[in-house]
Amino acid sequence: MTNKVIQRNIHISHRKASLVIDLVRNKPVHEAIRILSNTPKKFAPIVLKLLNSAISNVQHNSKDMDPSKLYIYKIVANQGPTMKRTLPRAKGSADQLFKRTTHLEIVLSDDVNEREKELAAIKAKKSKKPLAVEPIAKVETKKVAKPSKVEIKPVEKDENVDPELLKREQQVLKVVEKTASQKEEETTETIMISTSPKNAQVLFDDLEKNVIFYKTTPINKVLRVLVYVTSPTKKVVGEFDLESVEIGAISSIWRKYSKQSVISKKEYDAYYEGKDKAHALVSKKAYKYRNPKDLSEYNMTKGPSGFQYLK
């Protein structure tokens, strides 16, 4: 059996303490007392006092141990906390002092084979195998089939389709290279404008929203307006017959057409920021193409920045 005593925070360096404890390690207690009593070191009386305390503890409290067979089984001096202080020097400077401490530990034993027993216990602990953990059976999960893409079937001939829509879809229009003048008012009556996908959807799907706003409008008389949708669609998605074009102050145009507008008041104000006039294009009837058309069908490579005459 063993008996352990500890004294903490002894005001001495653990390196100086090690010089003393190395003299008595694994020695019988009576021999250790003789060595410490004749060692002229500051730490020797401290070790001797703690050793006598350990012997007294065995004699009075450990009935299972034989005091006559005691020896120092383990003795260590571990480093404790270090206190930092300063020493004043010349010219206002200071040197730093380190006041080190030591923790002294002494373990006594009466069994000569104590070391072998301790090593055997460690080996036995390491040799114990951990309990086998049964592997968790994998749960097979069925893969959910992805929904197949819905194919848009072409419109059959017998479906109820507006003949006017069919006529407009089949009509071939090309870009007018030169800008229309007042003399071409009777012959030039179709234009193409650009708008966002959101505005186009509102224009063609909501019958009550039939007014689209622009910053400029053509001089010539226009009866038909094709609608080109910007990114990501980038196609002509439909057209509408133009009922009228009204130009006026920004506030008055909004008061008149706010309920019919395809955009909100916030978008309207942002669109006409810094402008004096607003241009309202009022749709009489809108036609949404069943199959949107590419710009190449109109001999165009990019969408109109303002409006483009077609013929």
Swiss-Prot record:
GO terms for biological process: translation. Belongs to the universal ribosomal protein uL22 family. The keyword Zinc-finger does not apply. Part of the 50S ribosomal subunit. Pfam families: Ribosomal_L22. NCBIfam families: PRK12279.1, rplV_bact. Keywords: Ribonucleoprotein, Ribosomal protein, RNA-binding, rRNA-binding. GO terms for cellular component: cytosolic large ribosomal subunit. InterPro entries: Ribosomal_uL22 (IPR001063), Ribosomal_uL22_bac/chlpt-type (IPR005727), Ribosomal_uL22_bac/org-type (IPR047867), Ribosomal_uL22_CS (IPR018260), Ribosomal_uL22_sf (IPR036394). This is Large ribosomal subunit protein uL22. The keyword rRNA-binding applies. HAMAP family: Ribosomal_uL22_B. This protein binds specifically to 23S rRNA; its binding is stimulated by other ribosomal proteins, e.g. L4, L17, and L20. It is important during the early stages of 50S assembly. It makes multiple contacts with different domains of the 23S rRNA in the assembled 50S subunit and ribosome. One of its GO terms (molecular function) is rRNA binding.
